[in-house]
Amino acid sequence: RERFNISTAPLSIDVGDKHFIDDENLDREGLLDSMRNSSDAPKTASPGPGPFLDLYRKYDNIFVVTLSKELSATYQNAMLAKKMILEEAEDKLIKVFNSFSATVGETMIAYKLGELIEAGFNRDEIIEKTEKYIEEMQTLFVLDSLDNLIKAGRMGKLKGKIASFFNIKPVLGATPEGTITLVDKARGSKRAIRKLIEKIGERGENLEEKVLGIAHCNALEKAEYIKGKAAEKYSFREIIIVETAGISTVYANEGGIVLAF
């Protein structure tokens, strides 16, 4: 964040009677503990236009990266705030990017933007190259727990119980439209991780030019294993590992892994 001067308009999460703000002060262990002990699905809320307006007033040349607009109202609120601020100060330069992704996908887009800025590209070039990057970016993830999908009604209880009983792990991905889809499935975490690593080769192109981002939710050992195997098998320019933040933790749940490249 310091290197690229990144600020955040945080989302919020409610689990039962507990309220969490997804910023740098988030109690991630507290969030995980609340999710484990609640029969209700976590409820997430996007920031309204207000937090974006506060940030827009601080800077004149701004790039914004949001969660997929198919998953959250964050993009729409960032755009509404842009319209409002331009009525106050029409000379501000604000570009809002829909990530068509989530979690480490957003991180990788911000990383790309930072690299382009440091490399000295002009604003139009940065926008063009970033839009191309988003269009080509792949997001894949493996869930260790189906609890939140079941609680949220995204997976029927019976189907979820059968999957859990047979230890079936879904390999999921982002569609070009920014929704979540089933890519593959495997019995057991180890097989699911192997499939996840295989999918990199099936979906990725020009990997020597790209950075692989790996986000994990309390699963550093698993993330390190994937990093090692991906380094052996593919020619990524760089591989980075990050911990999931709040919303990412809700998506991934404990043991979850998310890749973006």
Residue positions per predicted region:
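N-terminal/domain-start segments enriched in small and hydrophobic, helix-friendly residues
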Residues: 31-32, 36-39, 49, 60, ...
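Active-site cofactor/cluster-binding pocket
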Residues: 47-88
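Short catalytic-loop micro-motif centered on adjacent basic/acidic residues
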Residues: 43, 64, 96, 213-214
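Structured helix-beta-strand junction loops
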Residues: 3, 37-38, 58-59, 65, ...
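Rossmann-fold dehydrogenase core element
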Residues: 89-93
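Mixed-charge interfacial surface used for oligomerization/domain docking
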Residues: 1-14, 71-74, 78-83, 95, ...
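N-terminal glycine-rich anion-binding loop in soluble enzyme alpha/beta folds
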Residues: 1-45
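Acidic/glycine-enriched edge-of-secondary-structure segments
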Residues: 29-47, 176-191
